């Protein structure tokens, strides 16, 4: 099983459809998208290039808890500009390690500096769960 995981790449499990928001939008705009799409994270783009990320946690900590007006606050003020990312050909193991080392729940996937996808803890958990189940099934047949 370890070999299967070692051979797998981020591109094998990343989400290719990433919901984004333009940099000039407000925190209110972001909150509406998060609610409507039932997601907790957006990639912030400028001219179709990722420039940051914003999460529900950012909104709670930097806007709600600080009593800041979400309707007039630009995303640039609260987004994380130094977001962590991986390339599609990165190993699953290296993606997990990057998440653990940086205490984060998701990674943006960039290919040639362009947004290619996103990978989350949930994606990784489902991938590992499926590998464990397959491995257990194979072992039970032997």
Task: Give the ranges of each region predicted by the language model.
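Tandem CBS (Cystathionine beta-synthase) repeat/Bateman regulatory domains
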Residues: 1-142
């Amino acid at each position: 099983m370890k070999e299967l995981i070692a051979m797998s790449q981020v591109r094998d499990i990343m989400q290719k459809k990433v919901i984004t928001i333009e940099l000039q939008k407000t925190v209110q705009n972001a909150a509406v998208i998060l609610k409507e799409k039932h997601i907790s994270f957006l990639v912030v783009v400028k001219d179709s290039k990722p420039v940051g990320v914003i999460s529900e946690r950012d909104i709670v900590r930097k806007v709600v808890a600080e009593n800041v007006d979400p309707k007039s606050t630009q995303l640039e003020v609260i987004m994380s500009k130094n977001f962590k990312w991986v390339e599609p050909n990165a190993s699953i193991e290296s993606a997990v390690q990057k998440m653990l080392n940086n205490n984060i729940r998701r990674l943006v996937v960039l290919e040639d500096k362009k947004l290619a996808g996103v990978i989350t803890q949930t994606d990784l958990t489902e991938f590992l769960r499926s590998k464990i189940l397959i491995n257990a099934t194979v072992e039970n047949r032997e």
